A protein has these predicted regions:
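Short phosphate/oxyanion-binding micro-motifs
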Residues: 1-77
Length: 77
């Protein structure tokens, strides 16, 4: 099982989201863990679905720091 963990230091730029998309496409992880997203959990829900993950949890950032997300493929349930 492949797990991708990344301290992305913010997902506000399209280029950073593109990098994440490329990493997921290349490695095809079963689980993705993101730290320092600097985004609200609600905003991460749309990205999670667009990247092919249906399951996951997220913790809101506080101001412009923090934020965590863990996504997994639905076959892991």
């Amino acid at each position: 099982m492949i797990v991708l963990a990344w301290n992305c230091r913010g997902l506000g730029l399209d280029s950073t989201v593109g990098e994440l998309r490329d990493l997921i496409r290349y490695h095809n992880p079963a689980v993705v863990f993101l730290s320092e997203m600097k985004k609200k959990a609600r905003a991460m829900e749309k990205l999670k679905w667009s990247l092919g993950f249906r399951c996951g949890v997220a913790v809101d950032c506080r101001g412009k720091s923090g934020g965590l997300a863990m996504w997994w493929r639905d076959h892991l349930q």
